Amino acid sequence: MPPFAERLQRGLEDENMHRALERFAPSWRQSRQALFEATAAEYGSDYSFVSLRQRLRAAKDEAIAHQQELVARFKEQATAAGAVVYEARSAEDANRYIYELCRRKGITLIVKSKTMVSEEIELNHYLEERGIKAVETDLGEWVAQLDHERPSHMVMPIIHKTRQQVGEVLSRATGREISRENVAEQVAVIRREHRQAFLTAGMGISGANALIAESGTVMLNTNEGNGRMVTSLPPVHVVLAGYDKLLPTFADAMTQIRLLARSATGQPMTSYTTFITGPDRPGKEVHIVLLDNGRSAMRADPRFKEALRCIRCAACANICPPYQQVGGHAFGYIYSGAIGLVVTPFHHGLEAAAGPQSLCVSCNACETVCPVEIPLPSLILDVRSRVVASEGLPWLKRLIFGVLARPRLFDLLTRLAAVGQWPATRGTPYVRYRYLRPFEGLPGLRPLAQLTRWRSLPAFARRPLRDRIGVRANLAATHQEGRRSDEMTVCYFAGCMTDRLYPEMGEAVIQVLERCGLRVVFPRAQHCCGLPALNSGDRQHGVAMAKQTVRMLERALDESGADYIVCASTSCVVTIIQDYLRLFEDLQLQSWLNRTRSLAGRIMDFTSFLLRVLVAQQRLPTLRRLRPGETAPVVTYHDSCQSCNCLGLRTEARQVIRDVLGLELREMRDSDVCCGFGGSTSIEHPEIAERLLERKLRHAEETGATLLVSDNPGCLMHLRGGVDANGRPLRVLHLAQLVAEYLA
């Protein structure tokens, strides 16, 4: 396989693929959602997506926990039905078994239906080196085979190709001119080419969507009839499947059927569902090869064993924004999509995952659609941590996170930067390309200048938030003397980005809280929550900052008697209430885990606090009237990934804009799709970030709105920078700033 950098560049340059994937993703999302909603409406909540995924997760967890018993049961039943079951420890073991079977039977031609496990073990290459021809009969797989490619998607192997490209491949392979436009003609050609192979092959190889332990049955779900021909026509049928395909019962398999096609392609079910229990006629042989190849190591890992639930639906690829920009050959190794980043280290080594995992923007969308609730985002971060532990961090990241973990040094350097940044900002709030362009030739400045070509970067504030509010006694208060019985106190955790880059956002938050009659405490010791380091796989500095934050918040609550901790950065909120828990549990730091759990119940994001506390308790003051000549803005809203995918916030901000403020809200297309920020990913892979940003801003402009609102400083930095760099007619605000503008 070509190196990652080469695969990535090819993916970035393939405009046909970008268009195909960007067309498919929204239509898939709509079809999938409509099907699950329709099923639940017709059959009840037991058939909703949430209920079905919980049932299938439970079945898969049972299979993982009791794998040995299920293997024994499956072997007993399959053998009784006339099949031969072989357990292969490794790729070499499985390949050798199949080759020796061919050699004993004198088989030189094999027909195959789609099986990702055969790709995993590189079976075709192994057999071809030994004089045995293996013909892929799945339409997409065969085109990929003819073009010397691997599948770029686990369900739709050539989703990256246009019909014109398919026509070219078929023309080269057949030596005849095949239509580039007529898909029916292309399919007819493939059908004719395969017929003789079906009739003369000595072996058919298939995968399995499930192995049902109670009966020794193989379940296959396909959309093409080739699967049934491969498994029925040749005298020898080999089923190649991992241990992870085991399910206890037929009922569990039915649950999987209800989830698989909807999750994979947005269709109610596959065209063909086939159950095979032993040979179907005298003289027919069925061999079932159960493959380990790293699965035992995965099962032994308390975190990664959850990945063994995967049913290979590829929903995680379908919804993934970076995948849509680079395709599966780059976003993965052999297995593509988010699950590919997770399982690759176990099947093909950590080095094979090192490049692809860097493409993940941590948007968490994959976890929301996974039909078996695999915590894919956190597992990808675990892979990233292992890559960093093995290969180390780039020197610049080591330097940045080393500074970030030292609050006093960070404070000093950011203040110096605020003074020394004038040549790059000219006194504006932005580091702009036109200011940096004259200095591109200086050492180290060209990469920075190129980053600002499409997105202006924020300038450091001359006066950070802590300086702007430090003179106000009620913000520095650390005692409860004179507190009224009905007075509510909140501890405001601003986050480093708001404090150092966007203090005006923090001032707006404080203004809203105080206008609602709250006493606001701003802990001077607050610093970075550690998110940048943790998202980069730097656990050493990330853990240090996590502990700093927990200590600081505990002390602030003790000294102020605050009722809540409010934060207007949903990324920071998710880091503290979700990521810290996983981190401390993983590191077996029980005391820190308990302390974080105590804090988590007191922390709320600004949007939720505004609605669930301030509005619910009728604390919000009267809104001001429009000034003479003032026109109310038309608003569109961007759902930050952490808000909608991690905290489940979907209607709350819209309620504030429409119902509380009374403003017109126009929904943009794909409002909950990542804007492309992704922390340091937007610096490491700017081409991807730029494309996602361009799409987001285009969708915002299509609404005709004049104001783009979100609730996360990271997204706002990205969106503001794109608007500034390209001169777009949009104003970009945090929701707190919008609310502050309309308070009387």
Regions found by a protein language model. Give the residues of each.
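Iron-sulfur cluster-binding electron-transfer modules in prokaryotic oxidoreductases
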Residues: Y97-R104, K114-I205, N209-T222, M229-T231, ...
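Residue-level signal for inorganic ion chemistry
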Residues: A94, C320, I603
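Gly/Ser/Thr-rich active-site loops/lids in small-molecule metabolic enzymes
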Residues: G227-L246, R309-R312, L341-F346, T651-E664
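Long, charge-rich boundary regions
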Residues: P345-R384, G402-L416
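Ferredoxin-like iron-sulfur electron-transfer modules
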Residues: L290-C313, G340-C363, I688
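Residues immediately within or flanking Cys/His clusters that coordinate Zn2+
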Residues: A307-C313, A317, Q357-E367, Q526, ...
